[in-house]
Swiss-Prot record:
Organism: Mycobacterium marinum (strain ATCC BAA-535 / M)
Residue positions binding K(+): 45
Name under which the protein is recorded: S-adenosylmethionine synthase
Residues where ATP binds: 17, 179-181, 250-251, 259, 265-266, 282, 286
Record localization: Cytoplasm
HAMAP family, sorted: S_AdoMet_synth1 (MF_00086)
């Protein structure tokens, strides 16, 4: 163990990171299809590389106009991110866009449309009719580190990434380019964040910018200082933080020209920054019949309400499904010794308050809507800039009554 305390690190990336471009494209296609046909079945994967975007996957939808417009949807999202010139390494207006999308497998569709409970067990409840779109395990987490009940390292990393994009788009630092990454290392003592140890900020920039005289001081003042001034954390000492700005030197070649990108390759950035476990399934480009996405959202909803209800200071919940079955095959609750009541009672209360069948999750969180594109960057959880249904604290009183 370090003499400075236990050090934990999380990272975030900006919306111009190649993998995040892909997440954004996939979710923009999803939203367009859901807007026209809320029952669309969508599994869209995107790959970007120098001058090229490839969009592939499986879609079943009645949204014919939106489907036919996918190429324009792709271009508009890339331009919105900020890749609008070959000088920046990528141009959404002129890049090649290749579409290779088929229909959802009928073998998968039968298990989603008519769950095992309805087909085999004779269940009459309409919520037993929709089965899980795949087997798998999903985790949710909440902790009282921050007002949004997220681990502090990932919350701070996301704030820095959002600020990087903000100062680029609003013209405060117009020489910045869309690609960028942030990393935050925090010292903990007895599970309490006590000191901001290291911040790494790497950002793409115009070629004629002096790193020492311009970029470094600008990033410290306009990005780091602004974020830390707004943080106002009770226990965190940020007075002696080590700051590394573009530690490799210049970062001119970025975006898809610097690295190929793929949908679903930033799943730790998307969730809890490595602080909590992950079931392995990515989110972007998937409609809510895919429990990789909808059940992970439901688990965050569960965990956040448990902590907000004062049942534990931190909690991790796991749910698991079998493909084609509505009811989960397992639920697991871990409170890490922070519980205020018996964890067995917490698990029982969760089962009473939350219906974790896929159809019920979709109903209760109102997921058949075009709400996913904003989640493609800066995290799916703990967002303070977007109203997301799985972040609402609407089950606190129900949990307290159930206990």
């Amino acid at each position: 163990m370090s003499e400075k305390g236990r050090l934990f690190t999380s990272e975030s990336v900006t919306e111009g990171h190649p993998d995040k471009i892909c997440d954004a494209v996939s979710d923009s296609v999803l939203d367009a299809l859901l807007a026209a046909d809320p029952r669309s079945r969508v599994a869209v994967e995107t790959l970007v590389t120098t001058g090229q975007v490839h969009v592939v996957g499986e879609v079943t939808t009645t949204a014919k106009e939106a489907f036919a417009d996918i190429t324009n949807i792709v271009r508009e999202r890339i331009l919105d991110i900020g890749y609008d010139s070959s000088d920046k390494g990528f141009d959404g207006a002129s890049c090649g866009v290749n579409i290779g999308i088929g229909a959802q497998s009928p073998d998968i569709a039968q298990g989603v449309d008519t769950a095992h409970e309805a087909r085999v067990e004779g269940a009459a409840d309409p919520l037993d009719a929709q089965g899980a779109g795949d087997q798998g395990l999903m985790f949710g987490y909440a902790i009282n580190d921050t007002p949004e009940l997220m681990p502090l390292p990932i919350a701070l990393a996301h704030r820095l990434s959002r600020r990087l994009t903000e100062v680029r788009k609003n013209g405060v630092l117009p020489y910045l380019r869309p690609d960028g990454k942030t990393q935050v290392t925090i010292a903990y003592e007895d599970r309490v964040p006590v000191r901001l140890d290291t911040v790494v900020i790497s950002t793409q920039h115009a070629d004629d910018i002096d790193l020492v005289k311009t970029l470094d001081p600008d990033i410290r003042e306009q990005v780091l200082k602004t974020v830390l001034d707004d943080l106002a954390h009770d226990t965190l000492d940020a007075s002696a933080v080590r700051v590394l700005v573009n530690p490799t030197g210049k970062f001119v070649l970025g975006g898809p020209m610097g690295d190929a990108g793929l949908t679903g390759r930033k799943i730790i950035v998307d969730t809890y920054g490595g602080w909590a476990r992950h079931g392995g399934g990515a989110f972007s480009g998937k409609d809510p019949s895919k429990v990789d996405r909808s059940a992970a959202y439901a688990m965050r909803w569960v965990a956040k309400n448990v902590v907000a209800a004062g049942l534990a200071e931190r909690v991790e919940v796991q749910v698991a499904y079998a493909i084609g079955k509505a009811a989960p095959v397992g639920l697991f609750v871990e409170t890490f010794g922070s519980e205020a009541v018996d964890p067995v009672k917490i698990e029982k209360a969760i089962g009473e308050v939350f219906d974790l069948r896929p159809g019920a999750i979709i109903r209760d969180l109102n997921l058949l809507r075009p709400i996913y594109a904003p989640t493609a960057a800066y995290g799916h959880f703990g967002r303070t800039d977007v109203d997301l249904p799985w972040e609402r604290l609407d089950k606190v009183d129900d949990l307290k009554r159930a206990i």
